[in-house]
C-alpha cells in the first residue's frame, strides 16, 4: 500500500503521479492502440488499475503495488472503451463501440452479463452507490439504468440525439442524483428514481463539455469542464453557478482529490493543472504529462479513511471515498433510494476544505428525502459565509454586537455551572420580558435543592445571547452532615404543611415529643436560623463572572434582612404559640427549612428578573446606537465635491481616449 496518495492520468500512455508534489512515480502502456487510453479506474484497495483504450483493443487489469505489471486481459477485440469498478472491485462494467454494456466477473475472469439496450456507441458507465445499478450514456443522447440484481434496464432518458452524452457521474451524497455533460455544452442533473431532469444548466459551456465531478466532501458542490477552456463550479441546492474560471487550453479530464480541496484537470495539450479551491484564480501547479491530450484522471481512494471505516466495522465493503459511500446494509432488490446518506458529519461547507471526508453510512429505507427523491442538505456552499446554526432567531438582531463584551462587563450573575434543584421551576413570572418572549424557556433559573451552604449559581443569558462560548467553571462546596440530612428528608412545602398542621392539631404522642429544658429549644432555633443567615450573606456577596465579589446594592441588602427577620419572627411566633416549651420535631424542622428556602428563592428570582431586564434594555440601546452610527457614517462619508471631481475626470479620460 502506498504511503502517499497518488493519481493516474491517461493519454498516449498511463502515468502515475504523487498527488502531493505532482512528481512522476511510474509510467507504462499495456495497450498497443495508437489512439491512446480513454478510461482508467482504481480498485478499492489502490493496488490495481484498470485501463481501456480508445480503439477498444482490450481491457487490462494491472498491478500497481510496486512496478506496474499487467495481470489480466479481458474483452479482446470487443471494442470496450470505458470502464468502472464496483465498490468491492469484484465486478467490472464496460461499454464501447459495439453499443453494449458488459459486466465482467474478475474472480472467474469471464463475462458475467451483456446488456444490449443502446443504439449507439456507449461513451461512459458508472456504478451507483450500492452497486445495484449501472448507468450508461451514449452518443445518441440516451442514459439507461441497468439493474444488476433484477437484470432489467430502464426506459432510456435524456435530451435526444442533439446532446450526445460524454460523461456521467453519481453524486457521493445524494444517492439518486446523477450528473451528465454533453457535446452541446449542456449540464444536467438527473433524478434517477423518477428518471427525470432535476435541473438543466443550459449554455454554461460554449463548446462540448468533457467532464463532470462531484465533491467528495461537499454535498452541494460539483464541477464541470469543457473544450471552451472553462472550469465551472455549481451549487446543487440553489441550482446556480458559483464560480467560472477560464484556463489557457481546452480541458478534457477532471477529478477531485479525496480531501475535496484540490482539483486535477487535464487539457488537450497534455498538461495537468492542479487547482486549490481556496485560491482559484490560477493553478497551483502545472505539469506537462502527455504528448497527446489527457483523456482521463483518477485519484486513488484515501487509504487512511478506508482503514478507519473498516476498524469501526461500518461496512464489509472497501470504502471508496471519492467514488461512492458504502452502506451498512442494503437489500438486493431495493430501489436506488433505499439508503439515505448520512448528513455530512463535518461542519458546514465553509469550513470543510482541509478536512478529509468520513465514510457515509446508509441508514435504511426509512430515511426522508425531498420531493425529487434527493436527500435534503443542511450545509451551505463552499464559498458561502459560515452560518451560526446555534443562534436563536429571537436574537438575530444582535449579530453585530460584540461577542463577549456585554457578558463580561455588565453581568453580576455567574456565567458558569448551575447547581440544579429537583423539580426545578422556570421563571414564568416575568411580565417585563416582552422583548424576549421565550427567555424563560431559553434561560431557566435553577435553584438549590436545600443544602443551604452550597452556592447557588445562575446562568447568565448574555453569553448565550451574544453567541459566545462562556468558560464553564464548576464550584461546589461540601454540604455539612445536617444539610445532607435535610436534603434527603426534604418534602414539598404543601406536604410538610399538612403534616405539621396535623401534628399540631391532634397533639403529639409521648414517644415523639420529649420535654427538654428551654435552653435546648433556644439552641435548636439558633441552629436552624444560622443557615438562613449564611444564604443571606451568600446572596449579598455572590461572586461575579470574573471572580471578584460584586456587592448587591444596599437597598437589596436591607430588603433581604427585612424579609429574613419577619420570616424568623413569624416562625418563632407560630411555634411558640402552638406548644410552648416543646422541642422541634423533624417535620417542623423541614417545614421551616422549606419556608426559608422558598422565600429566598422567590427573592432571588425577582432579583434575577430585574437584572435580565436591565441587560436586555442595555443591549437594545447598544443596538440602536450601532444602527445610528452606521447611518451617520453612510450619510457623511460621501464627499459630494470629490464625487463630482471623479465624474469630471472620468469624462475627461473618455474624451482623451476617443481622441488619442
From Swiss-Prot:
Main location: cytoplasm
Residue spans of the WD repeats: 1-31, 32-71, 75-114, 117-156, 160-200, 204-244, 246-285, 289-332
Source taxon at top rank: Eukaryota
Disulfides per UniProt: none
PROSITE patterns registered for this protein in UniProt: WD_REPEATS_1, WD_REPEATS_2, WD_REPEATS_REGION
InterPro entries: NEDD1_Spindle_Assembly, WD40/YVTN_repeat-like_dom_sf, WD40_repeat_CS, WD40_repeat_dom_sf, WD40_rpt
Gene Ontology CC: apical part of cell; centriole; centrosome; ciliary basal body; cytoplasm; cytosol; fibrillar center; gamma-tubulin ring complex
GO biological process, one term: microtubule polymerization or depolymerization
PTM entry text: During mitosis, prior phosphorylation on Thr-550 by CDK1 promotes subsequent phosphorylation by PLK1 on Ser-397, Ser-426 and Ser-637. Phosphorylated NEDD1 can interact with gamma-tubulin for targeting the gamma-tubulin ring complex (gTuRC) to the centrosome, an important step for spindle formation.
Residue list for modification Phosphoserine: 325, 379, 397, 411, 426, 468, 637
Keywords: Cell cycle, Cell division, Cytoplasm, Cytoskeleton, Mitosis, Phosphoprotein, Repeat, WD repeat
Residue numbers of Phosphothreonine PTMs: 550
Purpose: Required for mitosis progression. Promotes the nucleation of microtubules from the spindle. May play an important role during the embryonic development and differentiation of the central nervous system.
PANTHER family, A to Z: PROTEIN NEDD1
Assembly: Interacts with FAM29A. Interacts with HSPA1A and HSPA1B. Interacts with gamma-tubulin in a HSPA1A/B-dependent manner.
Name under which the protein is recorded: Protein NEDD1
The species this protein was found in: Mus musculus
Amino acid at each position: 500500500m502506498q504511503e502517499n496518495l497518488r493519481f493516474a492520468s491517461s493519454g498516449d500512455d498511463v502515468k502515475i503521479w504523487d498527488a502531493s508534489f505532482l512528481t512522476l512515480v511510474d509510467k507504462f502502456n499495456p495497450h498497443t492502440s495508437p489512439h491512446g487510453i480513454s478510461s482508467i479506474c482504481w480498485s478499492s484497495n489502490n493496488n490495481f488499475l484498470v485501463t481501456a483504450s480508445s480503439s477498444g483493443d482490450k481491457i487490462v487489469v494491472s498491478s500497481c503495488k510496486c512496478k506496474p505489471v499487467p495481470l489480466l486481459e479481458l474483452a479482446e477485440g470487443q471494442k470496450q472503451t470505458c470502464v468502472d469498478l464496483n465498490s468491492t472491485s469484484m465486478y467490472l462494467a464496460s461499454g464501447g463501440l459495439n453499443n453494449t454494456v458488459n459486466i465482467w466477473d474478475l474472480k472467474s475472469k469471464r463475462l458475467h452479463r451483456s446488456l444490449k439496450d443502446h443504439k449507439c456507441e456507449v461513451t461512459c458507465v458508472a456504478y451507483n452507490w450500492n452497486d445495484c445499478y449501472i448507468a450508461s450514456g451514449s452518443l445518441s443522447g440516451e442514459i439507461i439504468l441497468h439493474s444488476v440484481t433484477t437484470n432489467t434496464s430502464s426506459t432510456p432518458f435524456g435530451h435526444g440525439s442533439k446532446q450526445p452524452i460524454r460523461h456521467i457521474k453519481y453524486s457521493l451524497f445524494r444517492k439518486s442524483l446523477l450528473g451528465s455533460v454533453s457535446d452541446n455544452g449542456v449540464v444536467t442533473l438527473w433524478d434517477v428514481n423518477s428518471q427525470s431532469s432535476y435541473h438543466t444548466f443550459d449554455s454554461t459551456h460554449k463548446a462540448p463539455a468533457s467532464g463532470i465531478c462531484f465533491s467528495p466532501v461537499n454535498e452541494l458542490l460539483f464541477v464541470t469542464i469543457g473544450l471552451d477552456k472553462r472550469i465551472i463550479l455549481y451549487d446543487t441546492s440553489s441550482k446556480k453557478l458559483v464560480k467560472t474560471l477560464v484556463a489557457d487550453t481546452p480541458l478534457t479530464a477532471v477529478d477531485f482529490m479525496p480531501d475535496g480541496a484540490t482539483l486535477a484537470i487535464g487539457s488537450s495539450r497534455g498538461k495537468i493543472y492542479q487547482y486549490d479551491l481556496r485560491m482559484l484564480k490560477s493553478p497551483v501547479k502545472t505539469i506537462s504529462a502527455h504528448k497527446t491530450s489527457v483523456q482521463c484522471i483518477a485519484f486513488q481512494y484515501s487509504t487512511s479513511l478506508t482503514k478507519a471505516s473498516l476498524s469501526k466495522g461500518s461496512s464489509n465493503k472497501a470504502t471508496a471515498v471519492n467514488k461512492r459511500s458504502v452502506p451498512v446494509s442494503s437489500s438486493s432488490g431495493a430501489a436506488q433510494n433505499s439508503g439515505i446518506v448520512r448528513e455530512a458529519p463535518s461542519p458546514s461547507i465553509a469550513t470543510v476544505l482541509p478536512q478529509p471526508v468520513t465514510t457515509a453510512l446508509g441508514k435504511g429505507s426509512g430515511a426522508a428525502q425531498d420531493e425529487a427523491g434527493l436527500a435534503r442538505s443542511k450545509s451551505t456552499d463552499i464559498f458561502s459565509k459560515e452560518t451560526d446554526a446555534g443562534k436563536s432567531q429571537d436574537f438575530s438582531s444582535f449579530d453585530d454586537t460584540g461577542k463577549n463584551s456585554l457578558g463580561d462587563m455588565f453581568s453580576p450573575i455567574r456565567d458558569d455551572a448551575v447547581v440544579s434543584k429537583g423539580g426545578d421551576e422556570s421563571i414564568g413570572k416575568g411580565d417585563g420580558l416582552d422583548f424576549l418572549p421565550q427567555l424563560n424557556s431559553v434561560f431557566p433559573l435553577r435553584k438549590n435543592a436545600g443544602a443551604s451552604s452550597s452556592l447557588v449559581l445562575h446562568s447568565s443569558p448574555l453569553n448565550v445571547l451574544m453567541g459566545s462560548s462562556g468558560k464553564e467553571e464548576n464550584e461546589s462546596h461540601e454540604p455539612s452532615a445536617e444539610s445532607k440530612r435535610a436534603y434527603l428528608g426534604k418534602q414539598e412545602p404543601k406536604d410538610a404543611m399538612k403534616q405539621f398542621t396535623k401534628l399540631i392539631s391532634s397533639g403529639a404522642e409521648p414517644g415523639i415529643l420529649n420535654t427538654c429544658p428551654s435552653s435546648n429549644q433556644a439552641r435548636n432555633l439558633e441552629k436552624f436560623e444560622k443557615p438562613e443567615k449564611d444564604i443571606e450573606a451568600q446572596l449579598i456577596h455572590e461572586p461575579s463572572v470574573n471572580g471578584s465579589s460584586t456587592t448587591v446594592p444596599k437597598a437589596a441588602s436591607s430588603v433581604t434582612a427585612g424579609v429574613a427577620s419577619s420570616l424568623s419572627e413569624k416562625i418563632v411566633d407560630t411555634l411558640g404559640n402552638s406548644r410552648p416549651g416543646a422541642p422541634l420535631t423533624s417535620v417542623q424542622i423541614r417545614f421551616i427549612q422549606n419556608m426559608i428556602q422558598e422565600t429566598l428563592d422567590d427573592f432571588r428570582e425577582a432579583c434575577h428578573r430585574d437584572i435580565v431586564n436591565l441587560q436586555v434594555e442595555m443591549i437594545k440601546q447598544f443596538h440602536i446606537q450601532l444602527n445610528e452610527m452606521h447611518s451617520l457614517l453612510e450619510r457623511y462619508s460621501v464627499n459630494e465635491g470629490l464625487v463630482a471631481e471623479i465624474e469630471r475626470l472620468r469624462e475627461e479620460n473618455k474624451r482623451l481616449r476617443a481622441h488619442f
